[in-house]
């Protein structure tokens, strides 16, 4: 009996049973909401609203009767944005009202400043406020005042200058500026230092004897023109002030009124021996190979280019213009090696610009022919042999090229004369033009020449 059953009928029965089970289980599951109810999880694709789908009858795109019409807000009379909002109460002003109040206060604060400026430039008296407290200042008032040409009165604001000092100070500053323009940096420094010091503190004896107008009106002329006994060579020169004693003696005759304005400042009177020998017979001049001394006072000439340096103790071509002859000389060592006592002259004890002899760039026209080397013996300087130190013996030779060479020789020590008057009797004056084979030259002249050459080398080494 079991074999006779049809398999197809068996399959149909299973399908029917499964469908019946599904129908029975359906009420147990979640029910779909009716089409009229809103579901926030749904979104319409047509109108973009939530709660219904595109097929729902609630969509306004399908049912135009239920669509909302935009309501009009009403029209205002007049133009739009004429009064966009009502002003708030002043008791509680907003941020916009605060900004307006600050803008109104700023021009009120600037009004006194404008009045002060107008009074300063126009010179008109300030306006008095009205008794009711309301000022008559309008924006048009400022425009009226500024539009026309305003007179500027600067006489009241300009600092008053003493009429006595007005002429001299202006001329002095202009002339001094023109003099400074033609000087080298080293000379400008010396000029500024000497001008800053008072008349009693200046240590340049040569510049102290000159009156103040000499700096103003000489221009490119030499600051100190000292006339020796014979004729002075003409042409452009580079002058350096000589010793204080010589300048003082010559300037008294040339410029008697200079002493009233500016007296000479010297620590001690110069010894009569050096004064006599330097003031009457000597006219020292350096040749083209000479060096400019490091401690030179005010100079108002042009700065010439440097020449090649010579030996440490070498004297230039025209070291002794009066004698023109070489002479071994007994000299005292430099002041650093000896003690400086009361008997030492200021030229030996103090290295001031007054120790430097004058410099002449132009050699004399007529000069006798000299042998290669000549020598003579000279007595020792009384002021230099203060402590009895061993003196130096220097031999000066005249070279073929017109220059001088020096060499140190050992010399026995001897006692110098006690009085300066004895030195005057032993050392005659230097003649103008030498004709004898040997001429005695005062030792102070050669000592100053050596000191100038050594100081110039020290200054060049410091600059390099």
From Swiss-Prot:
InterPro entries: FAM90 (IPR039213), Znf-CCHC_6 (IPR041670). Pfam families: zf-CCHC_6. Residues 16-42, 70-389, 415-437 are annotated as: Disordered. Residues 74-89, 97-114 have a biased composition (Basic and acidic residues). It comes from the Eukaryota. Residues 180-197 have a biased composition (Low complexity). Belongs to the FAM90 family. Primate-specific FAM90A gene family, thought to have arisen during multiple duplication and rearrangement events. This is Protein FAM90A5. It comes from Homo sapiens. The gene is FAM90A5.
